[in-house]
Amino acid sequence: MLPLLALLLLIGPSVCTTAGDREELAFGAEAESWVTVNLKGIPVPSIELKLQELKRSRTRQFYGLMGKRVGGYQLGRIVQDLLGTRGLSIEGTCRQAASQQRARPGAVTRESLQSREEDEAPLTTSNV
């Protein structure tokens, strides 16, 4: 129905103009004005989507398919903002979980000894 309406809008004015003035068919600026039809009021989703895809660059099309960008934002940037500047170290969390599982209630690990030594070390200040 919609393509038929667009075709009717394109052909209608040209048929009316040529039927009234068969003698004067000049291809100038005036002749082109009756051929132009404004279709801004009629949205066609499939045409709009194809135009948007054509306007995007090749890299944006590729990364859109691969899921690298979501809604114009890069996923890495969002994750980095959420986690802070250090990020998340999977290796470190796995090691900590494994050492906590192996440690007995009374056992002392090397990391805990180092942190205790740092906490108990006296702070030296100088008055100059």
Swiss-Prot record:
GO MF annotation: an example: signaling receptor binding
Main location: secreted
One GO term of the biological process aspect: positive regulation of saliva secretion
Residues annotated with Methionine amide modification: 66
Secretion signal span: 1-16
Tissue specificity of this protein: Expressed in hematopoietic cells with highest levels in pre- and pro-B cells but not in later developmental stages. Also detected in uterus, skeletal muscle, brain, spleen, stomach, skin and lactating mammary gland and in cells of myeloid lineage including dendritic and microglial cells and macrophages. In uterus, highest expression is observed in non-pregnant diestrus mice and in day 5 pregnant mice. Compared with mice in diestrus, decreases 2.6-fold in uteri from non-pregnant mice in estrus and 10.2-fold in day 17 pregnant mice. Detected at sites of chronic inflammation such as granulomas.
Bilayer-spanning residue ranges: none
Ranges where the record places region Disordered: 96-128
Protein location: Secreted
Domain of life: Eukaryota
Keywords of this entry: Amidation, Cleavage on pair of basic residues, Hypotensive agent, Mast cell degranulation, Secreted, Signal
Gene Ontology CC terms, in alphabetical order: extracellular region
Family statement drawn from the similarity comment of this UniProt entry: Belongs to the tachykinin family.
Protein function: Tachykinins are active peptides which excite neurons, evoke behavioral responses, are potent vasodilators and secretagogues, and contract (directly or indirectly) many smooth muscles. Hemokinin induces plasma extravasation, mast cell degranulation, muscle contraction, salivary secretion and scratching behavior. Increases sperm motility. Induces potent analgesic effects and may play a role in pain modulation. Promotes survival of bone marrow B lineage cells and of cultured LPS-stimulated pre-B cells and may act as an autocrine factor required for B-cell survival and proliferation.
Full protein name: Tachykinin-4
Source organism of this protein record: Mus musculus (Mouse)
